Amino acid sequence: MKLKSLLLRYYPPGIMLEYEKGGELKTKSIDLLELSPSTDVNTLVGEIQKVEPLITASRTKQVRLLVQRLQEKLRQHCDHNFYLFKVLRAHILPLTNVALNKAGSCFITGSYDRTCKVWDTASGEELHTLEGHRNVVYAIAFNNPYGDKIATGSFDKTCKLWSAETGKCYHTFRGHTAEIVCLSFNPQSTVVATGSMDTTAKLWDIQSGEEVVTLTGHLAEIISLSFDTSGDRIITGSFDHTVVVWDASTGRKVHTLIGHCAEISSALFSWDCSLILTGSMDKTCMLWDATSGKCVATLTGHDDEILDSCFDYTGKLIATASADGTARVYNATTRKCITKLEGHEGEISKISFNPQGNRLLTGSSDKTARIWDVQTGQCLQVLEGHTDEIFSCAFNYKGNIVITGSKDNSCRIWR
């Protein structure tokens, strides 16, 4: 084995190794999820060298510099103040979703007007209108980290694959018999998965446009789906109160997670794929061991339905958003609530951590988005100006831009 190059991954912090083995170029990653601005660099580099034979003494200085750069990134933008940069009268009907590419250079908006639009983040200019769907464009995504393709899922029962650069439609995936409400690319960007009101999920080959496999077994609509970090497994959450873990290559059921007593609103893996988090209309979140499929904790405290939930990149913190107008942060190890985020005057439908993991973004029916301090629960900023509920909000990869999308037909860029 011969090390060819070292590359940085900023969020979550890690060093990617490109090496040659048997004439083939391979990659692996050293995940530094515990890294903080106060970590002792020399100690950490010593630990890395103990476990990674490719990092020899001659590479010590280089690795030390890379770790220091990662620490700088964790300090950057972590206390950013956001100001309104642009209001985009994006669509003639309400927006359904917004999504950014990894570079943050452009973002997309889906709408009830049957289109998806591609926007330049720096200028707020419209780059493309993706037309062709015959009903609401509901689910949208970039194939991050690459960002050169866009998938759109529609109430017209089809999913379309587009070029992010030219706006050209590559494929229309047909096969669902009801509305498509969620979708996701696998991390390798070889497959797109769609979840539908027809109770199935389907995986589609991006190159050929062919259906790879259909995931059948749910008894009601699939409302949420996501891949694990490796792309080997996919998880689906349904209105039948269950979550199913599937083998992404064969479509075989690996686990059925039974325990919630109402519809599932969100289901996702932690970054290291060891835990699964599920949120439900039964007012609870449940934490599951991803290997055994056993429930390890039920997170309680909300007085109404949980509408969204997420992990931070370390997998140590969990955030939940509820129809009770509050959000909560839980410690994933102790399963205790650390902070309660209070201030919204309506239900919170979206929540996400910034890439640095020290801020939370929430979007609410009270027409505002808010930025919160994760540790104290203090509201740091209220992003005001929308005239109707906020459906969707997101940080860019650096954490210094926020996009909000609203029922008022507009989206706003904050930076």
UniProtKB/Swiss-Prot annotation:
Coiled-coil segments on the chain, per record: none
One biological process term in Gene Ontology: outer dynein arm assembly
Pfam families linked to this entry: WD40
Location within or outside the cell: Cytoplasm, Cytoskeleton, Flagellum basal body; Cytoplasm, Cytoskeleton, Flagellum axoneme
Keywords: Cell projection, Cilium, Cytoplasm, Cytoskeleton, Flagellum, Repeat, WD repeat
Taxonomic superkingdom: Eukaryota
GO molecular function: ubiquitin-like ligase-substrate adaptor activity
The keyword Magnesium belongs to this UniProt entry's keyword annotation: no
Cellular component GO terms held in the UniProt record: ciliary basal body; cilium; cytoplasm; extracellular region; motile cilium; SCF ubiquitin ligase complex
WD repeats: 90-129, 132-174, 175-214, 217-256, 259-298, 301-340, 343-384, 386-415
Role this protein plays: Required for axonemal dynein assembly and ciliary motility in ciliated organs, including Kupffer's vesicle, during embryogenesis. Facilitates the onset of robust cilia motility during development.
Family classification: Belongs to the WD repeat WDR69 family.
Record note on quaternary structure: Interacts with IFT46.
Name used for this protein in its record: Dynein assembly factor with WD repeat domains 1
Higher taxonomy: Eukaryota, Metazoa, Chordata, Craniata, Vertebrata
